[in-house]
Amino acid sequence: MCCLFGMLDYKNRFNAKQKNKIISILSVACEARGTDATGIAYNHNGHLSVYKRPLAAHKMRFNIPDVNLIMGHTRMTTQGNEKYNFNNHPFYCEIGNTEFALAHNGVLYNDITLRKTEKLPETIIETDSYIAVQLIEKQKRLDFSSLGYMAERLSGSFTITVMDNDNNLYFVKGDNPMCIYHFKEVGIFIYASTEEILKKALWRIPYRFGKPKKIELEAGDILKIDRHGKMEKSEFDTSLLSAVSYYSHFPYRHISISTEHKTKSPYQQEYIRQLKSHASFYGYTDDMVDMLLDEGYTTDDIEEMLYCGVY
């Protein structure tokens, strides 16, 4: 249960101070989906910079220069201790003259298998998410083709954002949520993992952007937004994604709905325990959460119910 967030100010309407304010408010709103670590990526002085710490967003002190694109992530740890900062998002990589950063929301369970079958190098990074970086790196380029190659090999739940050192921003949409607003009047894209989080952040931001257009993405879509705000789409095959059962956030394994309660791993048990604890703040009992799981709802579905107040 992590959160992706960010903004692209392609008309450069806002100054550095205003962008720091926007990102600070947006990242704090994203704490609803993770407080173990926070990170951002941006381009400055011809170099892609990543700033991340094992801190909740409200404890971060951003000092972002006057840049156009900022990509962020708040983390709830499932695999890889957040105290080791290399496990936190975004992840940095270089392919020739291309620098890129990647952030992932979801849980992948075939990272160990992929590292063997794809003959990828071992790494000190412990998170399942990092396999996505390595799959792109193996293709020796960053484009629709390499992103599709990566996405079609991942088994689990995901939505992924990637930015490069030319201020191109990519969204790779799996089965996890993503909400993107385009404020064409002022020339800005703002996004977060859920519409509820994005709306709450926008309500708190002391600047008016005009009326947004929501950019619709389906599972299997890859969206590219370039530095000028131009959008381009591609697709990837979701057969592997849909072949696994839809328990979005259970670490390491996805298992069928009919057997889930009988075969929970310790990691799954801990995640459900945390979900129930969080649900109690909204007035939902443990029995209600169990009932929803028995009926086939995913943990992601239940999270959306909590944040959107529908049940």
Which residues are covered by each model-predicted region?
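Conserved short alpha-helical segments that host acidic/polar catalytic motifs at enzyme active sites
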Residues: M1-Y311
